[in-house]
A protein has these predicted regions:
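Glycine-rich Rossmann-fold phosphate-binding loop(s) that bind the pyrophosphate
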Residues: 7-10, 124, 146-150
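Cysteine/selenocysteine-centered motifs that mediate thiol-based redox chemistry or coordinate metal-sulfur cofactors
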Residues: 396-433
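A short, polar/charged loop-to-alpha-helix boundary motif
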Residues: 379-397
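FAD-binding core/adjacent interface of flavoenzyme oxidoreductases
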Residues: 1-4, 60-143, 202, 220-226, ...
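Beta1-alpha1 glycine-rich phosphate/pyrophosphate-binding loop at the start
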Residues: 1-69, 157-179, 385
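Mid-to-C-terminal Rossmann-like scaffold of FAD/NAD(P)H-dependent oxidoreductases
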Residues: 1-2, 8, 276-380, 384
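FAD-site-proximal beta/loop scaffold in flavoenzymes
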Residues: 116-138, 212-215, 220, 225-303, ...
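A Rossmann-like FAD-binding core segment of flavoenzymes
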Residues: 25-26, 70-87, 94, 161-260, ...
């Protein structure tokens, strides 16, 4: 059996490696972005001079041949699901028995005037990084539009090269559609501590201005202010990259529609995983879901490999988790922690704004006080420990008594659990020690 994978990001590469572990099937991975798999999360460190591209490749180049995974560096221009083959830009045709689409995502645009000018771009691919390196050389000012995780990474990249940057964020606090107020305030203040970054809250982009040669010369904000710049980073999120299937019978909505086995809807022997996949659940009561996360993409790759090589088993995401970095503040989240709590939820939080540290536990506000989620800033907690507590419905009191077990390095790292226990005793009027 020949398994053909389009896309060599973490989803596609994980699928290929897991299939090889489970079988002797022929595997081909096609990518137009790069010849070899690299760590996308490390692209920013190439720009900042901390790493070379070679250092972002987790595997030596000989690894793929040794493991009988064929790599094709080419662009797919057509898919024929009836005859079960793809066509490459080089003219080559590749037949398949199973096709896995792992085409990732692309930066979102909202139809702004001037969004296609030279010097205006998103940041997702290796080509985006190369373009940013070329277009930010010797510029006087940059503008970032959008306050998500890619936005703050871009701000750190530009800051490392001492490029004055105006950072436009629509919300009243940084990422406050995701972070509760205390976390959002800590991150907002931390961004503002960097002198060359001008953070503008409650501010949106209205228009990008042309210098007359097709390049950007500035932007106009929602308040009518004109800000001169030679580079604009559009970091208002990503969307599934489905261009490759638009002329096929493969169904799409936001992403490529798949069931809980990652099988494309109504298209036999085609699968989609990672950022490009939109899961439709058979029960009909769960909304369709796109999971544009590194951790999810890795899990998708492992799951689809097992479904092809072993018994079909529905994907189970398990307890949600994610991690990020806001300049030098590490962030981890496990379970359910929303910007605004539901009526059945309460929270216990301790924070130190001076040293930029925070611990938050969200729990049910009934008698059980079952723990639902954790947010951690500036402290490292173990994902497996926190997830296990959430999965088995551990109570707030049980978690607090054993909280040190979650600390990533309890022997040498500073301990903050006692502060959260003191907050519990104050709030719940107990004497937990």
């Amino acid at each position: 059996m020949h398994i053909l994978i389009i896309g060599n990001g973490v989803a596609g590469t994980t699928a290929a490696r897991t299939i090889r572990k489970l079988s002797n099937h022929r595997i081909t991975v096609v990518s137009s972005e790069s010849e070899y798999f690299f760590s996308r999360t490390a692209l920013m460190y190439i720009y900042m001079g901390h790493l070379t591209f070679e250092q972002t490749k987790p595997y030596e180049d000989w690894f793929w041949k040794k493991n009988r995974i064929d790599l094709v560096h080419d662009h797919v221009i057509g898919i024929n699901t009836d005859q079960k083959h793809i066509i490459l830009q080089s003219g080559q045709k590749l037949d398949y028995d199973k096709l896995i689409l792992a085409t990732g995502s692309r930066p979102r645009k909202f139809g702004w005037k001037g969004q296609d000018l030279r010097g205006v771009q998103g940041l997702y691919s290796l080509q985006d990084l190369q373009m940013m390196i070329a277009q930010t050389n010797h510029i006087k000012r940059a503008v970032i539009v959008g306050g998500g995780l890619i936005g703050v990474e871009t701000a750190e990249m530009l800051y490392s090269r001492k490029i004055p940057t105006t950072f436009l964020v629509r919300e009243a606090r940084y990422w406050n559609t995701v972070l509760p107020d205390e976390e959002s305030a800590i991150i907002t203040d931390h961004i503002r501590e960097h002198p060359s970054i001008d953070l503008r809250l409650n501010t949106e982009l209205r228009e990008i201005l042309d210098d007359g040669t097709g390049a950007v010369r500035g932007i106009i904000t929602s308040s009518g202010e004109e800000i001169p710049c030679e580079f604009v980073a559009l970091t208002v999120g990503v969307e599934p990259n489905t261009d490759i299937v638009q002329t096929t019978n493969i169904a799409t909505q936001r992403g490529i529609l798949v069931n809980e086995f990652f099988e494309a809807v109504d298209t036999p022997d085609v699968y989609a995983i990672g950022d490009c996949a939109e899961m439709r659940f058979a029960n009909g009561s769960t909304p369709n879901r796109v999971e544009p996360l590194w951790y999810a993409a890795k899990a998708h790759g492992e799951s689809v490999a097992r479904n092809i090589c072993q018994n079909r088993q529905a994907y189970n995401r398990g307890v949600f988790f994610n991690s990020a970095k806001f300049f030098d503040i590490e962030y981890q989240t496990y379970g359910t922690v929303q910007a605004k709590r539901n009526a059945n939820e309460d929270t216990l939080v301790w924070y130190d704004t001076k040293n930029k540290r925070l611990l938050r536990i969200v729990f049910e506000n009934d008698g059980s006080r079952k723990v639902l989620g954790f947010n951690v800033l500036g402290i490292r907690y173990r994902q497996n420990v926190c997830s296990a507590w959430i999965e088995r419905g551990a109570s707030l009191e049980e978690v607090l008594k054993n909280l040190r077990a979650a600390n990533f390095d309890p022997e040498f790292a500073p301990q903050y659990e006692s502060f959260l226990i003191a907050e519990y005793n104050r709030k719940i009027a107990q004497n937990l020690v």
